[in-house]
UniProtKB/Swiss-Prot annotation:
Lineage: Eukaryota, Sar, Alveolata, Apicomplexa, Aconoidasida
Segments of skewed composition (Acidic residues): 429-438
PANTHER family: FLAP ENDONUCLEASE 1, FLAP ENDONUCLEASE FAMILY MEMBER
Name of the protein this chain belongs to: Flap endonuclease 1
Binding-site list for Mg(2+) 1: D34, D88, E160, E162
Protein location: Nucleus, Nucleolus; Nucleus, Nucleoplasm; Mitochondrion
Length: 480
């Protein structure tokens, strides 16, 4: 679920904290990805046929998560991004009540799905299918194996994946956390990226002009959130608990706006409870806000010394066996994936170097042009001054003026030459970028039947092999 209404409240109250970015803005960046959330999105988005069933192998086992994960990971790498996938561990005890509620919702959705199938209601089938999707323990293990064979770093969190992702940004081992769960901000991630997998498949019904905007992501900056809301991190955590989180109930009658006003006035939940009208606002009998607060401040995560991040060479033959023999993927398709994977690994490194040197070259050229222009103006000024102050030496002044004009002409030629050179570099860079972009575009059959993404966030329970959630419509050199 994340934090109820948090993203909208931030957008309304601290708009400078949220901005749209293109995936190109993450070129060369290490991004920690909430793997469980990604798998759910792939399973719900990649469907086969009108009945919205998952892609399956010959044994009837779902392969949508494998297809989606492989395709999206390669796509991210082709755009210069360096992904780290973080998997959930055991859910915290405080989350037990929330998991029970999710189980009840899933059971209700399964009943509605059966009814919709009996009636042939395709729209309802599509809606309820998404609500009954589960990411099993086996699917998680298959995803880990796939990523390992591809040479992509995999981290297994002792508890919540988004908490581990957040701490990777604190350790400066990652630039951002990619998840739809806004509670990553409460765990302290410096940057939250949403919609990283929103375009995991092409939707036949999406706006035809949307592709012109590029691959748009949402970036939320925690520092700007706190600055915009004028809250300390401790106050922000208490505010989010009052809004509604996975770890405890909240005070009835208090939404995000009221919670914010109360935190601004009283600073913490303890003071709020002491001062509010409890006839108007019902405080839960067993309000575990202290435990929830500690879960956000000191979550169960791997320490920096325990985290190992290695981008390894892909194990090509093992990868082929896993995809073709074990999961019945088309051999031609797999060969294409592997070719793109190997190329993307080179592109990721090369593009980072190209970006560095191109940036330096452009900057240096610009500075040289500016300095040359200043020299021209300086020369002009000196020439005029000599003419005014040296009337007694007319012939000498005339000679100097002639020299100045000659120098000015020479400097102007130098400026023009540098400008032309700069323009040529810029054009070349733009052409190279377009070539890279064109090479990244691909159309996969498995991605043609995507489900609509809904605006509600819920997390996975790995230990029970179960989740229920809806996907939102809408988000140093390592280099972090």
């Amino acid at each position: 679920m994340g934090i109820k209404g948090l993203t909208k409240f931030i957008a309304d109250t601290a708009p400078n904290a949220i901005k749209e970015i293109k995936i190109e803005n993450l070129m060369g960046r290490v991004v920690a990805i909430d793997a469980s959330m990604s798998l759910y999105q792939f399973i719900i988005a990649i469907r086969d046929g009108d009945q919205y069933g998952n892609l399956m192998n010959e044994s009837g086992e779902t392969t949508s998560h494998i297809s989606g994960l492989m395709s999206r990971t390669i796509k991210l790498m082709e755009n210069g991004l360096k992904p780290i996938y973080v998997f959930d561990g055991a859910p915290p005890e405080l989350k037990g009540s929330e998991l029970e509620k999710r189980g009840e919702k899933r059971q209700k959705a399964e009943e509605l799905l059966i009814k919709a199938k009996a009636e042939g209601n395709l729209e309802e089938i599509k809606k309820q299918s998404g609500r009954t999707v589960r990411v099993t323990k086996k699917q998680n293990e298959e995803a880990k194996k796939l990523l390992t064979l591809m040479g992509i770093p995999v981290i297994e969190s002792p508890c919540e994946a988004e908490a581990q992702c957040a701490f990777l940004t604190k350790y400066e081992m990652a630039h951002a956390t990619a998840t739809e769960d806004a509670d990553a901000l409460v765990f302290g991630t410096k940057i939250l990226i949403r919609n990283l997998n929103a375009n995991a498949s092409s939707n036949k019904n999406k706006n035809k002009n949307s592709s012109k905007r590029g691959y748009i992501l949402t970036e939320i900056n925690l520092e700007q959130v706190l600055k915009g809301l004028k809250l300390t991190m401790d106050e922000f955590i208490d505010f989010c608990i009052l809004c509604g989180c996975d770890y405890c109930d909240t005070i009835k009658g208090i939404g995000s706006k009221t919670a914010y006003n109360l935190i601004k006035e009283y600073n913490c939940i303890e003071n709020i409870i002491k001062n509010i009208d409890q006839n108007k606002y019902q405080v839960p009998a067993n309000f575990k806000y202290v435990e929830a607060r500690q879960s956000f401040i000191n979550p169960k995560v791997l320490e920096k010394s325990e985290v190992k991040i290695d981008w390894c060479e892909p194990k090509i033959e093992e990868l082929k066996t896993f995809l073709i023999k074990e999961h019945n993927f088309n051999e031609v398709r797999v060969t294409n994936y592997i070719t793109r994977l190997l190329k993307a690994r080179k592109v990721t490194t090369q593009r980072r170097l190209d970006t560095f040197f191109t940036t330096c070259t452009k900057k240096s050229t610009k500075l040289i042009i500016e300095e040359s222009q200043k020299e021209v103006l300086k020369t002009k000024g000196k020439g005029k001054k000599r003419e005014i102050n040296n009337d007694s030496s007319t012939k000498l002044n005339a000679k100097k003026k002639k020299t100045n004009v000659k120098d000015e002409k020479k400097n102007n030629e130098k400026v023009d030459e540098l400008k032309n050179k700069s323009d040529e570099n810029l054009v070349k860079d733009e052409e190279d970028d377009q070539d890279d972009y064109d090479q990244n575009i691909f159309d996969e059959k498995t991605n043609s039947e995507s489900g609509n993404i809904k605006n509600e966030n819920v997390k996975e329970d790995v230990s029970s092999n179960d989740i229920t959630m809806d996907i939102p419509k809408c988000t140093n050199d390592i280099v972090c």
